[in-house]
Amino acid sequence: MDTIRKADSRRGRIAYEVAGLAWLAEASDPGAAVVPVLDHGATWLEEPRLASVSPTSRVAEEFGRALAHTHAAGASHLGAPPPGFEGDGWMGEAPLSLPERPRARGIAEVGQGGPRPDHARPGERATASSRGDSWGAFYACERIAPYVGDRTFTAAERALIEKLCERLESGTLDHGQPRLVEEAKSRQSNIGAARTHGDLWSGNVMWTPGGAVLIDPAAQGGHAEGDLAALAVFGCPHYERILAAYNEASPLGDGWRERIALHQMHIIMIHCAVFGRSYVPEAMAIARRYV
């Protein structure tokens, strides 16, 4: 078997990926297929080398339906880490908070240039009162505010992001999960969020002769619409067929298409923090749309 070996000496990086792949793989029947980990150590992992082919619309539809079932496998709460992993994770080169519960903090940090990825505090654990914490508050405080810094955004740009975060925290932009996730939440008291890949841009879906395979996750409890939105950030083959099949298997809430850009704000903010101002106009366009 032809294999690939990934190495990363930074603490916790490999452990997070291995735990995330295993967690997603638990749902791979009937959920989406996941690349297997053949072997791993503290600073490396080995996977089979996957052959790549051009996807057909049929395979894309199969992936959409399977992804709906992966999400419905559930997670305990928004931001939940994969079982067996403790601490914060990463999304590409950016630190990613994985709180025990969403932090009980306000958005004032945004206007003050909240912690940038290079100022993150891994190991700082967060708590809150219940699994019913709102998506908007979580998204504002954990997925937008940490990536605002005075070296990337102007004062006016930070103020606009703060307005978006205020609206998110108010709850006016909250919305339910797709039907299968909501049904899982109603059946099981230990499920409060979707089980998400967390970094599902199109490059992290391998189209193989046997179908779509997920790779390189930032696995976490999240909102299912976040994965669907991420697929569109850089374009995805047969995207509309994926969405249609997903929506057939697990109907999305009213207005889901109008929320795609909102769910893309996280990945765009990370790109601003990591790559600089070239992504700022896109972040500003999203913020203006939803304030």
Predicted regions and their residues:
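A mid-sequence, solvent-exposed acidic-amphipathic segment
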Residues: 158-184, 188-214
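ATP-binding pocket architecture of kinase catalytic cores
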Residues: 2-134, 141, 184-187
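A general structural signal marking secondary-structure boundaries and capping sites
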Residues: 25-28, 71-78, 151, 172, ...
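Hydrophobic, aromatic-enriched interface-forming segments
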Residues: 123-178, 191
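Active-site Asp-x-Gly
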Residues: 128-140, 192-195, 202, 206-258, ...
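Alpha-helical elements of Rossmann-like donor-binding domains used by nucleotide-donor carbohydrate transfer enzymes
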Residues: 16-23, 62-69, 163, 167, ...
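ATP/Mg2+ or Mg2+-diphosphate-binding catalytic cores
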Residues: 271-291
